[in-house]
Amino acid sequence: MSEYSLFTSESVSEGHPDKIADQISDAVLDAIIAEDKYARVACETLVKTGVAIIAGEVSTSAWVDLEDIVRNVILDIGYNSSDVGFDGATCGVMNIIGKQSVDIAQGVDRSKPEDQGAGDQGLMFGYASNETDVLMPAPITFSHQLVQRQAEARKSGLLPWLRPDAKSQVTCRYENGKVVGVDAIVLSTQHNPDVSYKDLREGVMELIVKHVIPAHLLHKDTQFHINPTGNFIIGGPVGDCGLTGRKIIVDTYGGMARHGGGAFSGKDPSKVDRSAAYAGRYVAKNIVAAGLAERCEIQVSYAIGVAQPMSISLNTFGTGKLSDDKIIKLVRDNFDLRPYAITTMLDLLHPMYQATAAYGHFGRTPVEMTIGDDTFTAFTWEKTDRADALRAAAGL
């Protein structure tokens, strides 16, 4: 639910330059974790016309073919020809990854794993609300679904003139905290030069927008802005430079919840920017799934080298069945939010991260994956397997 009468969120496709960078960073992380699950990885990526640069710090015994990883990500997204503005097969790849600082390592590593310190200071937020089936805000959920559908229509050949870069934006109308309508939809998609605007608009409206947005939420005054500038032929890294970590609101809750500022992609689970944000989502989602509140935002903070959180705060915005203080006690009693405990609780030491790097880290479906000999569940932070225990502990 929302205290707003109107709320807008945006998303971007896997072919957006910043998302290319995120996916490359997480593909590097996955490749290293697949060989050395205790590796320390911080990988940043920059993509621009004809070049991809990876930089950062890594501590690992593994060897991976970084250039091959970078090229495969770009090609899999669909940038496979100079005709679309970028070609993963021929672009330059520059690697300037170095070793992790020993000063950071001594603050994180411990002889007893459960005493592992946080990889940095910082504050992280988790959020959930009951306004959608996936316990996410509706505007960001619809925005993700639009660009996901754009990619499906492009890759399947349903709309063969689509190109990889795309952005979406959805404005939802709320009454008494519930979504009652969609007032505006913006969808900008890169396309081939030979498609007419009439055909593009018709195809996008019928096969993307109407496929995603529930008909009962559309009304006579809903505004549809499909490629509002007219042409969107030049896109991807030619049109804009892409950087890891530039879409942190797209990655999370579309602005409906607060954000601590730390990006996710390219970071192994010892970095609480990522793992504690996942844990925050897990806690908040289980609170809402348990019926303890209709809406919940949790904040956790850490100090570098210290295992225990500095603080745990929580707000149910007046929707809680219990006081926020009592729910915080339930959180402390049922969730261990030390870094190592989070990694264990959510089973994070697997090569699952490239799958998170487009279309949002939250509101996804837990899915079993097999990479090499490793079979695991991705998106474990979306499980509601502690809801019953929370409900029982609350006496509901």
Curated annotation (Swiss-Prot):
Predominant localisation class: cytoplasm
Cofactor binding description: Binds 2 divalent ions per subunit. Binds 1 potassium ion per subunit.
Compartment(s) of residence: Cytoplasm
Residue segments, region Flexible loop: 100-110
Keyword Glycosyltransferase recorded: no
A Gene Ontology BP annotation from the UniProt entry: S-adenosylmethionine biosynthetic process
One GO CC term, this protein: cytoplasm
Catalytic activity: L-methionine + ATP + H2O = S-adenosyl-L-methionine + phosphate + diphosphate
Pfam families: S-AdoMet_synt_C, S-AdoMet_synt_M, S-AdoMet_synt_N
Obligatory cofactor(s): Mg(2+); K(+)
UniProt xrefs under SUPFAM superfamilies: S-adenosylmethionine synthetase
Bilayer-spanning residue ranges: none
Enzyme Commission designation: 2.5.1.6
Family: Belongs to the AdoMet synthase family.
The protein's assembly and partners: Homotetramer; dimer of dimers.
Role description: Catalyzes the formation of S-adenosylmethionine (AdoMet) from methionine and ATP. The overall synthetic reaction is composed of two sequential steps, AdoMet formation and the subsequent tripolyphosphate hydrolysis which occurs prior to release of AdoMet from the enzyme.
Protein name: S-adenosylmethionine synthase
Organism from which the protein derives: Pseudomonas savastanoi pv. phaseolicola (strain 1448A / Race 6) (Pseudomonas syringae pv. phaseolicola (strain 1448A / Race 6))
Lineage of origin: Bacteria, Pseudomonadati, Pseudomonadota, Gammaproteobacteria, Pseudomonadales
Gene that this polypeptide is encoded by: metK
